[in-house]
Amino acid sequence: MTDESMSYREKAYALLQADAEKIIQLIRVQMDHLTMPQCPVYEEVLDTQMFGLSREIDFAVRLGLVEAKDGKALLDRLERELSTLHEAVAKKRVR
């Protein structure tokens, strides 16, 4: 699909998905190393990225470019990934 044939709504959602994917990659890198809770800098970066994405989603929803339910689904996916990371780190500590 070319840029010309994509609607603004599709472009907005694609950009939000790309930003969400970057955050997921950040989470997965930390899962590979299981270092997240010991690293306050990482946690600060992740919190900032999540907050920024939530603001992007809110802006796109307010413009009518993205449905609120779709934006919530993106954030929910990130929350699940983050929860998985916390569980993995907790299991590592118990061992």
UniProtKB/Swiss-Prot annotation:
It holds the Pfam family DUF1507. It comes from the Bacteria. InterPro entries: UPF0358, UPF0358_sf. HAMAP family: UPF0358. Belongs to the UPF0358 family. This is UPF0358 protein GK1077. The lineage of its organism: Bacteria, Bacillati, Bacillota, Bacilli, Bacillales.
